[in-house]
From Swiss-Prot:
It comes from the Bacteria. One of the essential components for the initiation of protein synthesis. Protects formylmethionyl-tRNA from spontaneous hydrolysis and promotes its binding to the 30S ribosomal subunits. Also involved in the hydrolysis of GTP during the formation of the 70S ribosomal complex. Signal peptide: none annotated. Residues 243-329 are annotated as: Disordered. It holds the Pfam family GTP_EFTU. This is Translation initiation factor IF-2. The gene is infB.
Amino acid sequence: MNVEQFAQELKLPPQLLLEQLKAAGVSKNDVVDPVTEADKAHLLDYLRKMHGGGGGETGKTKITITRKQTGEIRKTDSTGKSRTIQVEVRKSRTYVKRDPAALAAEALAAAEPAAAAPAAPPPALEEVPAEPAPIEAQAPVAETPAAEPAVVEAPAPEPAVTAEVTAPAPVEAAPEPAPAAKPEGEAAPVKKTTRIKKASILNEAEVKAREDEARRHQALLERQAADAKARIEREALRKQAEAAREAAKLAEAQKAAAPAPAAPTEKTLHKPDKPAAAKGAKGPDKKPAGAWKDDAARRRGGLKTRGGAAPDAGWRGRKGKSKSGQEETTFVAPTEPIVREVLVPETITVAELAHKMSVKAAEVIKALMKLGSMVTINQVLDQETAIIVVEEMGHIGKPAALDTPEAFLIETGEPGEAEMVARPPVVTVMGHVDHGKTSLLDTIRRTRVASGEAGGITQHIGAYHVETEKGVITFLDTPGHEAFTAMRARGAKATDIVVLVVAADDGVMPQTIEAIHHAKAAGVPLVVAVNKIDKPDANPERIRQELVAQGVTPEEWGGDTQFVEVSAKANTNINGLLDAILLQAEVLELQAPADGPAKGIVIEARLDKGKGPVATLLVQSGTLRRGDMVLAGQVYGRVRAMLDEAGKTVTEAGPSIPVEIQGLSDVPQAGEDMMVLPDERKAREIALFRQGKYRDVQLAKKQAAKLESMFDQMGQGEVQHLPIILKADMQGSYEGLAHALGKISTDEVKVNIIHSGVGAITESDVNLALASKAVLIGFNVRADASARKLAESSGVDIRYYNIIYEAVDEVKAALSGMLAPEKKESVIGTVEVRQVFVISKVGTIAGCYVTDGVVKRGAGVRLIRNNVVIHQGELDSLKRFKDDVKEVKANFECGLSLKNFNDIQEGDILEVFEVVEVARSL
């Protein structure tokens, strides 16, 4: 290793290192000179001597350690509010290590006069601190409070000599403490004699230095003893306070703890539970009655850090009561990480999560960044993400218990000992579109519902109850169109029996299979009605075979499904179908409590211009009466009016009876559970809580979707969007239409439904369409006068539809127009090159003959030589008889040149083509 490499290793300039080597007596003249281990040793010795590392009095090694500790205190102001204040404590300690060889020489020199003089123990007092290194190293141990009395009490000279030679042993072994004032007073004259006797060996400066060192060491040992004692008592107080906190937390979690008693004076809101017990543990001289006597002194006293204060300082330290200022602010850092159990609700902000873990919000944001999420301090996190973050930061995350207003519903939801009575069966009629479901119900009800539906197809759930000679049956008629999957699923959820209508001349179709799956998923028995058996091409046996393939086996083939052949048009075997339904209902033994608060399900909901929100309910248990307070999902309200399916006013509805109610605060979601609550305050509280919870969950999901689909969104610049605002008469209608429109989207064009709702088209809808350049679609609704006027003046397109097919077809046509056209090449002519002219300023001109088709200026051209395409470009100029022409037809000669290409030879063939754009369709 040379000087330059050594300097790089020491991170010093090479010239400075050369100067230091020369000063140390090592002859090095250049940075490339080699450096040996001996040279390094010489340099090290020189540097030690220069910086006080030599022997004698300069042989002392001093180490100064500065410690900075940060704690927190909670301070109560005059208003009773509690604040957290940061407290910083700084300590500086100097440790001195002396040369063991010098100490041994001094000890031997002092041994001779010590043996001769009877009053020699004081030198032991001077000599014991002479080796402070091992004592300092053991200072933090709690067993050393009695070190200083041991040295003072040694009466005989023999222990003194032993103490000097093996200094650490008597320091730790002395068991009995003794007051230090009297021995110090007696030892003073002896020290003077000792100095005279040792004058021949030690000079007076050394003796004085050792005396000062002994006094400093004595004071240090006293401080260490006091620190150790205070630390033990503080630890006991801390554990006691921690146990009290844990007990308080447990009591709060179980909601069983009584509220804390009020403090006798103000500004004591956060007192520990047992301050008197903590003071009583100190000693009998402390009076328990004085725990609150001098409260003003407590408020004026020292601050309490998180690690605790002096043991006799109570909850807040008093002036003059602690041993030293350092003891009050001593902070004991935790030796192991604190693992907290964090209860995470369904949604939580980053700031709240950081507060629960007692960390700064920046730490939580860093952890989320490491997980790939860029968040802010007010970002809402969903429960799953928050638990992952908690576990990532070393704590235990658990989903929070339901401490919500909805817990009231769980408590009140259990039915009591209400009497159970038989209830009518709820029958859902399902099947493929145009298989005759509604016509079959018409025949049963002897009405004409199907003819009133737009296009002859059902687009809503119709709920009716029919009183037959054999009993009451409630029917739910669901749409068969593929767009109404969600509506059919709701029908299956609320039903007891599913009647599957299959046309005998059509067979099993996709919606028939879907209805079977819905019934099986809901665990509902099936009754198959084979309709249209009066048609000539009806084949009931084929229907049975196709249904067996789908897992529906008729009873006559050994299965458990009843098959009934009916004709809605000819009114054939309708009573047989009703008998089959009632037989299945008897097997199910359907019962429900007739008394008590009603419960049910929202079948359909709409916004009526005159009546407001209107919901169709199916009561499942209890009795719904006019004036009841109803809660349905996020909406609530008092039942102002109740109508049956015929539009007649009724005052109450029992189990399995469908009714229309008015008086809700908003249009509820179809499929929501409905229940009656005792008071409006509780209903409003739960509804508002659900609204906020839904909003937070949607926001958290949207944020998660944004993060997950970041890469997917990068390529969406080329995708065309058709913005649509959708308004419908019923909630199920816009659900079905939105589903159907979403299915026709492709990778190039997408339908973007920016707003959908129930009710007429209003002025705000037109303004939204104007701002977002959207198309307004009204399904079975119309625009009001102000909206119509605004739409005409602003040019907003409003489309009205009554049949779902028409709406889907027109939107599909609009999307087809947004597709990028397909480009195709069409060859329009062929040209043969017969002569080539080279003109310096123009380039190569080809004299050609048009053999086929036509040549147009600006058309694309391919140059073919020996049946190989040499060049593809476009015509630059086209002339005939020195005149520029637009086109030259077959069997005529012309002159032409190609753009940016001159390699034309006689005999080449030019193929002329045009690019034609062809419209695409979905």
